Structures are given as structure tokens and as C-alpha cells.
UniProtKB/Swiss-Prot annotation:
InterPro entries: ATPase_P-typ_cyto_dom_N (IPR023299), ATPase_P-typ_P_site (IPR018303), ATPase_P-typ_TM_dom_sf (IPR023298), ATPase_P-typ_transduc_dom_A_sf (IPR008250), HAD-like_sf (IPR036412), HAD_sf (IPR023214), P-type_ATPase_bsu_IA (IPR006391), P_typ_ATPase (IPR001757). Part of the high-affinity ATP-driven potassium transport (or Kdp) system, which catalyzes the hydrolysis of ATP coupled with the electrogenic transport of potassium into the cytoplasm. This subunit is responsible for energy coupling to the transport system and for the release of the potassium ions to the cytoplasm. It holds the Pfam family E1-E2_ATPase. PANTHER family: POTASSIUM-TRANSPORTING ATPASE ATP-BINDING SUBUNIT (PTHR43743:SF1). The system is composed of three essential subunits: KdpA, KdpB and KdpC. The keyword Acyltransferase does not apply. The lineage of its organism: Bacteria, Bacillati, Bacillota, Bacilli, Bacillales. Its EC number is 7.2.2.6. It is an enzyme of class 7 (translocase). This is Potassium-transporting ATPase ATP-binding subunit.
Amino acid sequence: MMRPVVVKEKQIHVVEDEVRQAKTMDRDIVKHAMKQSVAKLNPKVMIKNPIMFVVEIGFVITFILSFLPSHSSSIPGWFNITVSLILLFTVLFANFAEALAEGRGKAQADSLKQSKKDVFANVVKENGEIVQVSATDLRKDDVVIVKQGEMIPSDGEVIKGLASVDESAITGESAPVIKEAGGDFCSVTGGTMVVSDEITIVITSNPGESFIDKMISLVEGAARQKTPNEIALNTVLTSLTLIFLIVVVTLPIFTNYLGFQIDTAVLVALLVCLIPTTIGGLLSAIGIAGMDRVTKFNVLAMSGKAVEAAGDINTIILDKTGTITFGNRMAHTLLPVGNETIEQVGKWAAISSVLDETPEGRSVIEYVQAKSISYNRELAEQGEFIPFKAETRMSGVDLQDGTKVRKGAVGSVIEWVRSQGGTIPKDVNQKADFISKEGGTPLVVAVDNRIYGLIYLKDTVKPGMRERFEQLRQMGIKTVMCTGDNPLTAATIAKEAGVDEFVAECKPEDKIAVIKAEQDKGKLVAMTGDGTNDAPALAQADVGLAMNSGTTAAKEAANMIDLDSNPTKIIEVVGIGKQLLMTRGALTTFSIANDIAKYFAIIPAMFTLAIPQMEALNIMKLTSPLSAILSALLFNAVIIPLLIPLAMKGIAYKPMSSNALLGRNLLIYGLGGVIVPFIGIKIIDMIVGLFI
């Protein structure tokens, strides 16, 4: 009775340790980000963000002015230094947001670097001699033998043997995967370990070009480039900043004409409040955090452009097998023929499957047991198993008493029964056609010269796929299923799964044709694949998600790689892309809406003394002109760190149409962006008013 308690206590301690380590790591990331926020004050770094660079220049100007005698009697000596400090913290907060996002990526890179240990490889020379060399000395096309318990030294493809490989260092999945020569599962990754048997691989990458090297480079941000959307938005924001800069610089000309002067510090404060500093300070963090969210989802995006493109996808091309369906045909029901009973069909179907280790064979046993149909297992185990062959298209067992039991393709079993001198029941082909039209695969069960019935094998649609496709439909995304099945079977699966369109008897070149046809309509297309024959289509698609278990050609052609090798993850990737675009759009809306309240705070404060009628614009009833300016600046600075969690996590995303999303975001972040600063500035003014 005590052992389960002990196990639970151990599990609790493990969880507590993991939580403690996560908190420690978060503290380390925050500390590093705080240091980096100061280091990023370097003008060479700041100029990459023109908006915050203008704020930094404003800090320098007001800081210098604080040590010079003031020519304005209305501006006290402490005002300039206060403004300069607020501007400094505004820049520091923006730098902190970017450094925090980068820090999370670097933490992931550090964990990946731990998997790059000093590894030695057994290289096979041309003369057959085996030489041990360091993994760093390996070059492309070198042939290496990797034995049980050894680390795979670099990326490669299996050319001989079969082995179980532990890829947990890369994918986080503890269950080993089978790698073998030929086919779509020959690709191996450096840093993974062979846990059984032995394989010979040919190296496919030079030092510094391996999969792990690329991952480290990407998550560290070294390879990160601004996306087209990010560049376009940055250009718009920079243009706004330039326009407001011209307005502020020329403003003294008009105020002199009106007979009064505006202090330089007030002009700087006006400029900072006018320009979109909120989104300017968070823009880089949003992009980096978007990449980070994809990486945490165990998907490696080759660029931020790929993540953004996922958010704009209009069409998704999906393989049926393994994506929409489980890929394993399972026994769905039994159909007796002639005067036979379902118990007789089940009995002989089970006997033919006892020694059959295929998923189909096991599913027959499970079905018969679930239906409580009795059969003699020992009788089958004592017989001689006849495995499935492409030539015969049948499998079964020859019993010790000479009885021959077979199950297999309709035509093959019918031909075999006729060769035994048997007759064919009239309803065999009729029931076989019925199964095919239902989207299933018929297997005929026969004993010697007598057919007993059919096994209805069905490739089951994964649970929840219809609901997920409905969500995509609400988002305006069309789903297209590609399958090698005949049109009848394809139509049945498509209807059951709820996809919009399907392509039956599809060949690899047909996928490219489908992608090009959609792109010719102005659509952005995403697809998944794992084989060499998928590589051209993955390269053609706007978003190509390759499986990590697939071939090197597929992974090189794609712009995203799923480390878990789960094709359905393309749906989640699209959601992350949309969340990234929505977060950027929502915070841009919020930032620009903020300016409305800041105008009502700072503009009356600047002009009330010269133009008393401007007091009518002081709808917030702020304490004094100086208090109004400082309150607007303080809110402008404080809102950046308050929005960092939202920028990092992304705004809540729900599948809906583009128009519905636009209306929702305008209501929440547009109207909210107007209301929040009115409240925030008023509260800050009440506090500041106590001290001035």
C-alpha cells in the first residue's frame, strides 16, 4: 500500500525540481536582459530601431539641457533632468523587451549546445580500413559506422542496416524511432544515439552546417532577418516619426509668431508622445517571440518569413494517410457470404491472423475478441504461417491437419479458391464493392475451397479532424486532401473528415499542380511531406512543413521542420502565424490609439498659457501643465513593460473570419487604446500633482 505513495512523492519532487529550475532559468534570463538593455544603448545598435533612436537622442538633449541655465521662468530646473530620466527608462524598457525575447531563444540554444558533445566517429576508408576521427573532422560524403550505445556524429543517411535511434535530445520524445536504409526513414541527425543494432551512414553535412548548428543559429537570433511585413510596418512607423519630427522642429516658428516660446524639453516631450513609441519598442520582441513560440512547439522555422506566411495561408494541402487518418487499416466489421455466419467468419479470420504481426492482423484479433467470438489459438500457433507477399497478395496459416486458411485481396483469394476446386458465392464481389464504396479495404477469408466472408478494413479518421477543419473553414482556409486511393474511397474519407476538396489517385507531380493552381489564384499554400518525392512540392509551397523523420531532400526543400514528425501540426503552425500577425496588428492599433489621449494631455499643457482657450481641451482636468507633460511621458514609458507579457505570449486567438477578427481587435485594442491612457494619465497626474 505504501509503494504508490512513495512513487507519487518522488513524482512530486521531480515536478518541484523542474519548476524550481524553470524559475531559476527565468530569473537568469531577466538578469541577462536587464544587462543587455543597458548594452543596447549603444547608438550603433539603437539606430536599427529609428523610433527608439529618436527617443534616445531626446534623452541626450534633455540631459545636456539639465546642466545649462534655463531661459524660461515657467520651467523649473529639475524639469529637464526629470524628462531625461523618463526618456532613458523608455528606451531601457524597449531594449529590455527585445533582450528578454532574445534571452529565451538563447536559453534554448544553450540546451541544444549541450547535445553537441565531443564525439568520435568510426570512418570507413576506401580500402575498407576503419579509422576513428573526431566528429569535427568529418566531411560530406564520409562513410561512418555507428554501433549500439554510440552517438551519431553528424547528419547523414543510412545506407546499410537498421537500428533504433533515441532522438530525445532533438525532439524531446523519449520513444526511439526506427531508421533503416532506403525509403523515407533513412535520415539521421547528429547528436542522437543508436540504442540498438548497428547502421552505416553517409555524412550529408560539413561542420557548422548540421541540423543542430542551424537550430542553434536560428534560436539564438544570429540568422534572424526582419520579415517583409515587419519591414513594411517599420517603414510606416519611421515615416510617421519623421513627419512628427518635422512638425516639432518647425513648431517654434509658429509659436514665436504668436508671441511665446516653448522650452526645448517640452518640445522633446511632445515629439516622444506623438511618435508610436509603444509599438516601436515592442516590434522586435513580437517577431522574436513569434519564432520562439514556434520553436517551443517543436517546429523549426527557417525564417520569420515562414511563420508570417503561415499566418496568411489560404489553402492547406494534406496527405490522407497519417495526417487525416491513422494510416493503419483496422478491422471495422465482418461480412459473411452465402449461408455462413459471422461467428464462422470471425473464427477463421482470427486463426489466419494469430501469427500475423501486421497492424491489420492484430486488429482482426482485437475485433474478434471484442465481439466474444471463440477460436482455437493453439491450433493456429502450431501451424505454419504463410506471410503476405506482393506476388500472392494473401497471408494465412497451414494447419497440422492439412487445412489451409487464407485472407487477402479479393481477386487473389477468389483465384486461389478456384484453384482448390471451389465455387465462388454470388455476393462476394457485391459486398467487396460495398466496402470499397464506403472507403474501406475488403479482405476475403477462405478455408481450402470455401469462402466464408469478408473483413472490412477501415483507415480510421483521426478524432477531432472534422472539428479542426471546420475551424480552418471559419478562418477562410480551404483544405485539400491528396490520396492515392480511388475516387470512391477518397470521396468517402473526404466526406467523413470534412475536407473541402480532394485529389484521388494523386501522384507527387499532381501535388505541385494543385499548389500552382491555387497560387495562380493569388492564394498562399501550405503543405506537409516527408519523402524525397515530396521535395519539389514542399519547395513550391509558400509554407512547406517537412517531417524530421523524413529524407534530407524533403527537409532541405521545406522552410519548416517538425521535430515530432506529426503532419497534423501544420494546422497549429497556421494558428501561431495568425497569432503573430494579430499580435503585431493589435499592439500597433493600441499604440496609435494611445496617442489620442496623449494629445489631450500635452497639447493643452503647451499652449494654455499663451492661448487660454486651449484649456477647453484639458478634458482630463490635469493638475498643471508640467504635471500633464510628465504624466503623459510616464505613461508612455510604463506602458511598454506592462505590454511585454502580451507581446511575448501573443494575444488570445480564436478561429474566425478576417472581418470578425478585425472588428474584435478594433473594439478591444482600438477603443481600449483610447480609454486606457485617459485613465492611466489621470492616475499618474494625481500622484505627480502631490509633488509639484
